[in-house]
Amino acid sequence: INGYYTLSMEKIAKLNHLVGGVEVTIQDDFSKVDDTMKLGSTIVLTDEQAYTYVHDRYNVGDEANLSRMARQREYMKSLFTKVQQKTKEKSGYINTIYKGLKQDATTDMKGKTISKLTNRISKGTYLGMHTLEGQVSTGKALGDGIDHVEYRVNDQEKISVLTEIYGLQEGKEKDE
């Protein structure tokens, strides 16, 4: 890893605002949290709804983290598509987002490096995200004495996904 750029979950609303909202199809029942977010409807999320959509787990659908992660993937895919579209319309658009989040992000990269990286990303193709297979169980791994739903990834699945991503073969590097 040559650098990192992080944005806390609490800043999703601000990111959403900077891009003018992100369109998603509501995947879970949000009726206990926000009755305007109706299951199956396609909406452009308000800033507060964007945070709710990617953050909330309890009182939403089956309350499973896997469901929340699916919503996060959908949000990221739609965000990527929107940013890519807006960047094609206005080449400096990505810099507007960067400047808007500068005080909220944590990074070890300089502006020039981020600019090069975002330029490459904006011209790229969204290849999706991997969900690793595993088992859902209930446990007390957080140490708070409360049963929580936990997800444990199969070791073989970890190897399989890393092999797919990096083109690894036993005993060989990708370019050998």
Language-model segment annotations:
Residues 2-3, 49-51, 124, 149:
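Intrinsically disordered, low-complexity segments enriched in small/polar residues
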Residues 1-3, 38-40, 58-67, 80-88, ...:
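Second-shell loop/turn segments in exported
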Residues 45, 106-176:
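C-terminal solvent-exposed extensions
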Residues 2-6, 52-53, 128-131:
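Structural recognition of the beta-strand scaffold that forms the well-ordered cores
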Residues 11-94, 173:
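Flexible, polar/acidic helix-loop-strand segments at domain edges
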Residues 33-37, 75, 96-100, 115-118, ...:
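Short, surface-exposed, charged/polar-biased interaction segments
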